[in-house]
Amino acid sequence: MSDSVILALGIAAFTVIVLVLVAIILFAKSKLVDSGDITIDINDDPEKAITLPAGGKLLGALASKGIFVSSACGGGGSCGQCIVKVKNGGGEILPTELSHINKREAKEGYRLACQVNVKGNMEVELPEEIFGVKKWECTVISNDNKATFIKELKLAIPEGEEVPFRAGGYIQIEAEPHVVNYKDFDIPEEYHEDWDKYDLWRYVSKVDEHIIRAYSMASYPEEKGIIMLNVRIATPPPRQPDAPPGQMSSYIWSLKAGDKVTISGPFGEFFAKETDAEMVFIGGGAGMAPMRSHIFDQLKRLHSKRKMSFWYGARSKREIFYQEDFDQLQAENDNFVWHVALSDALPEDNWTGYTGFIHNVLYENYLKNHEAPEDCEYYMCGPPVMNAAVIKMLKDLGVEDENILLDDFGG
């Protein structure tokens, strides 16, 4: 057999092998890679069914059709908010979901929408209130410091639009890839001391992807045409100075009047109960936001006659905000009082009010001698340490879980 024949046979054999491998790959791709359109049936309602190309996650698939499921972490699987019921399709539950979904819930079909792959036709069940969630492009009215590490972001809703939220609710705010230099922040001179002390100006936040985070609203329903947030800058902890700063808080702090911001909502479950029970509000830091929303709503819109008090913890006098507003509400409403406790008062504060941590102040100066603390409703929002301390104190007083309402976003 000549060399040319051997060469030709070799080339032919190689070509056949390549073609076989290509055929195998294409077959595998047809089985493993999502392709074609699929249908997601929602709430057994043909009018709610959506059709779209296979691929991606359920959270994104729903959002692409204008159905916005709450996800404070932006689909990272860490917040556990995007729980939906998958009745058919979606595959097996993933290990990443089990920290948010117990065995009973998993058996009933509950899943994290951000973790469910959309590969074929599905049947899901969503809360009806989700269909009232919309998306808006808002305009920044102002973005001012209210404390050393807290800004009040005020957004204008598009003219003619309305965000039909309830007091205690929240919205999600979005940001595209960006770079934020802390040295460019507009911070009044009175707050520079701590920024200089910890050299916070050196930080840079670089974000390479679209992000979404949730923030409780400080505004209340009667404040028409605006959304107001209290946003604490998430700087790296002192023990980890080289850790990256908070992505969304850095972005929000960089916003200036006239900038455009995309939000979606309303969401929420931190709502006031419709009872006559006494209301005790406990807040700290940016946890002020839902406290303001609730208290303003109760006293200004509902004209509630329920007995209520507000206990707010701050480091020093400089960290107190909305003081004039709450002083006025206290003067105008016999059923409302509010108190501030400073945990680290400065000499120049000349502070004569309560000092210490707010859970201790609340207990020693009110609940210890309250005739029935277990009958009150407690609404709280603040740093995790504060929340844990308050909950323990309330449990020790015999308060049942149903009367302890916690907003995890504000701190």
From Swiss-Prot:
Family: Belongs to the NqrF family.
Species this chain originates from: Haemophilus influenzae (strain PittGG)
Protein EC: 7.2.1.1
Coarse class of the protein's main subcellular location: membrane
NCBIfam families for the chain: nqrF
Record flagged with keyword RNA-binding: no
Pfam family, one: FAD_binding_6
Gene designation per UniProt: nqrF
Localization, UniProt: Cell inner membrane
Details of cofactor binding: Binds 1 [2Fe-2S] cluster.
The protein, known as: Na(+)-translocating NADH-quinone reductase subunit F
